[in-house]
Amino acid sequence: MDMDLNNRLTEDETLEQAYDIFLELAADNLDPADVLLFNLQFEERGGAELFDPSEDWQEHVDFDLNPDFFAEVVIGLADSEDGEINDIFARILLCREKDHKLCHILWRE
């Protein structure tokens, strides 16, 4: 895969894209009670956080997860408005290079 450092999504664009994908697919992949909980609580406690891909993605994909081009977005709820997300609904792996649309999602079980 040829990738260009100058053709990447910004961190904000990456978060926005991951959240849009989450909203589009959540109803088909989460328990209805979880979807309801997330929708009711997101305004107060919800969030999306951007990370370098964790090593456990290697169990799910068979390519190099260079953090210059791949990001992991964690979407869920925190105990408080400024707290860390500890109730995870989805972990989304995205390629940030604009010409390589790639997404993998690990949903809450």
Swiss-Prot record:
NCBIfam families: PRK05094.1. Belongs to the putative dsDNA mimic protein family. It comes from the Bacteria. Transmembrane segments: none annotated. May act as a double-stranded DNA (dsDNA) mimic. Probably regulates the activity of a dsDNA-binding protein. The gene is yciU. This is Putative double-stranded DNA mimic protein YciU. It holds the Pfam family DUF440.
